[in-house]
């Protein structure tokens, strides 16, 4: 399993020969490691409707034929935008696609799609657990800290957790460290920080918070474009 951070909350997860692209905010992302034309996913997972997460998902799926996975409202929206292959689901559900198990889990945030200054339905924000033969990864999406994370850890046992640390709109370093304690992954990778001034954070602070809790978890700090492999 190879996990590449593309900046912000965007990741490429290569698992069991399947390329999974999550929250592809690439256009307009000053830290993006790739452009929309440089990705060729099999699946595109969208956690919620905000522009820095839905991002280029529709355009990428239309260009590549990738399947877009999203909560029901986002899947229907994508279909209306011309995406041919969608998998709609909802929190608590698991689907099997491309040989992988994909589970939608709760995220505490908001979700709207804005078009021409008008808000259209974006459904409920979610996270994902992606599981295959080579391992499992939990992408938390944008979220605050919640006890749901303990259940996510107990039920799905993700080996790698991708967690926002930017604060203001999501957890900060302290809350994200507590999330690590609840989830009990083997590896934690911080995300959703440093893209814009309101979410500037030092990822080393997150690492220190995890260490202060005495957790036997490896914190891997990536630069955009760097990968973690296991």
UniProtKB/Swiss-Prot annotation:
<dbReference type="InterPro" id="IPR050114">
    <property type="entry name" value="UPF0173_UPF0282_UlaG_hydrolase"/>
</dbReference>
<dbReference type="InterPro" id="IPR036866">
    <property type="entry name" value="RibonucZ/Hydroxyglut_hydro"/>
</dbReference>
<comment type="similarity">
    <text>Belongs to the UPF0173 family.</text>
</comment>
<protein>
    <recommendedName>
        <fullName>UPF0173 metal-dependent hydrolase MK1542</fullName>
    </recommendedName>
</protein>
<keyword id="KW-0378">Hydrolase</keyword>
<dbReference type="InterPro" id="IPR022877">
    <property type="entry name" value="UPF0173"/>
</dbReference>
<dbReference type="GO" id="GO:0016787">
    <property type="term" value="F:hydrolase activity"/>
</dbReference>
<dbReference type="InterPro" id="IPR001279">
    <property type="entry name" value="Metallo-B-lactamas"/>
</dbReference>
<dbReference type="Pfam" id="PF13483">
    <property type="entry name" value="Lactamase_B_3"/>
</dbReference>
